[in-house]
Amino acid sequence: MSLFENDLYQWRETYFVLFAQSARPQAAAVAAALKRQDAHYEVTEVVADDAGQLESLTLRSPEDSSAMDITFVTGEEVTEQREELLNTLAKSTLGEGDREKLNFLGECDSRFDIYHFEEASFVGGGEDADDPLDPGALLLVMDCLAKLCRGVGVDPQSGSLM
């Protein structure tokens, strides 16, 4: 069950990891790497394709009161996003490391969508009653995925490369 269908969680933001499909990791390797990243992570609902490559998974981080749905995407949607990112980022001032990542984006034809959720542990509170969500687990997960697939993390809200 997707976290979107779970009343215990509220979606907050979506980040991406773009990569070349040839570097798509095995589902078992992703689950193991995430568990090594933090022993408190609960990795469930791991789905693989026929070749054993990751399709999707759910990760819960009870210590951060957060969770993530991670899904694999490829095709025209990724190509369009890649072109938009290339056009936008090419006009901005980038450091040397970001320039290398930008050049690599041109080779990317796949991505992982990381949907970040916050535990809805408040009763009757509105969005403004919440404390700001700590993105620590999200950033660690994004970094782990980027290393596994030799990809580039993207924060679409700020347009920055991670």
Language model segments and positions:
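Short, extreme N-terminal segment that most often corresponds to the first beta-strand
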Residues: 1-45
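Short glycine/proline-enriched loop/turn "hinge" motifs that connect secondary-structure elements
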Residues: 6-7, 101-109
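Short, surface-exposed beta-edge/turn micro-motifs
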Residues: 11-15, 54, 109
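Residues in well-ordered beta-strands of folded domains
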Residues: 17, 60, 113-115
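Well-ordered, non-membrane alpha-helical segments in soluble/globular domains
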Residues: 26-27, 88-95, 132-139
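Hydrophobic, Leu/Ile/Phe/Ala-enriched alpha-helical segments that form helix-helix packing faces
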Residues: 29-41, 93, 141-149
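Short, intrinsically disordered low-complexity segments
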Residues: 35-104
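Glycine-rich, aromatic-bearing surface loops/beta-hairpins
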Residues: 108-162
